[in-house]
Structure formats: structure tokens, C-alpha cells
Amino acid sequence: MDFNLNDEQELFVAGIRELMASENWEAYFAECDRDSVYPERFVKALADMGIDSLLIPEEHGGLEAGFVTVAAVWMELGRLGAPTYVLYQLPGGFNTFLREGTQEQIDKIMAFQGTGKQMWNSAITEPGAGSDVGSLKTTYTRKNGKVYLNGSKCFITSSAYTPYIVVMARDGASPDKPIYTEWFVDMSKPGIKVNKLEKLGLRMDSCCEINFDDVELDEKDMFGREGNGFNRVKEEFDHERFLVALTNYGTAMCAFEDAARYANQRVQFGETIGRFQLIQEKFAHMAIKLNSMKNMLLEAAWKADNGTITSGDAAMCKYFCANAAFDVVDSAMQVLGGVGIAGNHRITRFWRDLRVDRVSGGSDEMQILTLGRAVLKQYR
């Protein structure tokens, strides 16, 4: 596998560098993080470059550039300090609707292409159904030609401001044999109550509880096929886990470079601290983890472009990168010392963000279970 960037990919990476150098984005990110606000102005700038169209097929006005290109862009954005976790719906969110949605649903979502605005997210997790997705209690019930949605969701990303949510629910008329179906829900409908939650990290993307009280839908609001809810979201889980891993790597690389620059200029005991062997040991271990993450992610991206990526690959990336990246950021914070914990350094934001990623998008434990099954399956 040759991971040298082609001309198109080099242009994207160069464009990212130019954008990130165009203004003090870090001040904007710090403000958005402090106020728990989605950085729409930044995402709009990326959309103007075509970043939200990287995976959209050419016949739908996209670039069809592939996952290796997505990886190159995400890695560079992260290295330069951008909160790529706010972009999870951009690479594949449009394609999900092109593949599964009705024409009306497709038109509503594709209208967001190029805008930088949040458009939709999935609502699966519930108070009693986290990793145990099969314990979902939210129901849809048909009555007098309408469909009524009842139940509660929690920890739903982007849901404070996104105009649409795809809700996983079980058929209320089939309690003994659960049928799980997704529904395309306009968040302005009566009966929906949203409660925004505070988070340790990833603050630029909202996290909410959502209650549905007899929310009236039509049959045309069904998303995909009835009873196919679980099968569809499995692919979405793999996609999300790969993107989370890319974000983890980029963030860790940024922290590593910040710490390296600091170590080479901070003087103690008459020498720069980078001359001390204990500090050098930290950088050696950080470099090993970063190199391992990068190679793993580029191989996974290549597999995705060639149609051979598996759920095991995605779980491996998510687990390893979430943990390795957190270790890198934690070590970088140790190098920075008081600057890292008492000042306004972005390392504190990185540390908070990466700790969340060992839970969100699938916990460490669920990634290990998924990966273990996938590994052994190859030898049956």
C-alpha cells in the first residue's frame, strides 16, 4: 500500500493549511468550547472548500474522493488544532440519505450541502439502553392512518440545534417479537422536548435528552425499511468509529507538536527540558503511539476504499486510537506542566475531549468485544 498523497489530496491538505493560517481559529474554538456552541463559521469555511462533499457521489454534486482523502484531511485538520469531532456527519451523513432515504427526505438533507449547518443525527441511546441496544423502549404505534412516537432518548449528539433526527423505535404492536424501525423526525413537531446536557468534553457539539410524547408522524416519515433499523445502524457505527479514531489521532498529533515545541524552549536547571532523558522517554513513547495510530488508520481507510473494511477493523481503530491518543495528550500535558493545567492552553480542551471518546461512539469495552469476535471469526 502506497500512502503517498496524490495531487488532489495534496491540494486539499494545502488548502487546510491555508485556511488554518488565515486567522486565529484557536481563539474562536476556545470561545465555542467555553460557551458550548457549534463552530458554524469554521464548518462553513470547510464546506466552501468542498470538505462536506468528499464522499458524495459525483452524480449528486460530490467529489467521490474516498476515505484515504478523508483521512488525510481529518489528520491535517486535527494536527492544526481543529475540533474535527463536530464534522462526523459531513463525510457520510449525506450518503446515508442518498442510500436509505425517500426522495423527499433526500431533498431536505441535501439542501444543507455547502452550508456548514448541522442537519441530522441518529437517536438510538436511551436511559436503559446504552451498549445494550436491544433494550430500547421507545415505541411507534399506528393509529387512524398516523404513526405516534413515544419514549425517551439520551446522550444524543447534535440534537440541541439539528433540525432533523432519525429515531430508532420498536413496534408497539409487536411486544413479544421486537421490530426495530427508524423514523425521520422534524424536531419542530409538537410533543418533542429537548434538554441540553453538560459534558466534560466535546462541548462544541451538543448532547441532549429528548422526550417524545405522542409525536405524530406519517408513514412517509419511515427511514429505510421497516424492521431494518439495527442492520442499517451497524454500518453507521463502523463509519462513526473510524472518524472518531481519525479525530483522536489528529488531536494527539497537535498536542505532541505543542509539547515538543515547549520542551525545546523551556529552560530548567540551565538546559531546555527536552535535553532531559525522562522527557525524551515521554516523546519516544508518544511517537511510537502516533506512528502506530497513523498506519492503522491509513490501512483502514484503504480497506474502506476497496470495500474490505470490517466491523473488527473499525472497532480496532476506535479502541486503540481513543486510548493511545489520550495517553499522548496526557503525556504532553505532563511535559507542559503548570502551563497545561493552570493556563488557557488548548491541551486542556484536548484532554477533556479525548477522555470522552473512550465512552462515546461505543465504549472501550464494546470495542474489545466486537474486535474479539471478529478476530476469532476469521479462524472458524
From Swiss-Prot:
Gene3D superfamilies: Acyl-CoA dehydrogenase/oxidase, N-terminal domain (1.10.540.10), Butyryl-CoA Dehydrogenase, subunit A, domain 2 (2.40.110.10), Butyryl-CoA Dehydrogenase, subunit A, domain 3 (1.20.140.10). Its cofactor is FAD. It catalyses: 4-(trimethylamino)butanoyl-CoA + oxidized [electron-transfer flavoprotein] + H(+) = crotonobetainyl-CoA + reduced [electron-transfer flavoprotein]. It holds the Pfam family Acyl-CoA_dh_1. GO terms for biological process: carnitine metabolic process. It is an enzyme of class 1 (oxidoreductase). PROSITE patterns: ACYL_COA_DH_1, ACYL_COA_DH_2. The keyword Flavoprotein applies. Signal peptide: none annotated. GO terms for molecular function: acyl-CoA dehydrogenase activity; flavin adenine dinucleotide binding. GO terms for cellular component: cytoplasm. Its EC number is 1.3.8.13. Belongs to the acyl-CoA dehydrogenase family. Catalyzes the reduction of crotonobetainyl-CoA to gamma-butyrobetainyl-CoA. Homotetramer. This is Crotonobetainyl-CoA reductase. It comes from Citrobacter koseri (strain ATCC BAA-895 / CDC 4225-83 / SGSC4696).
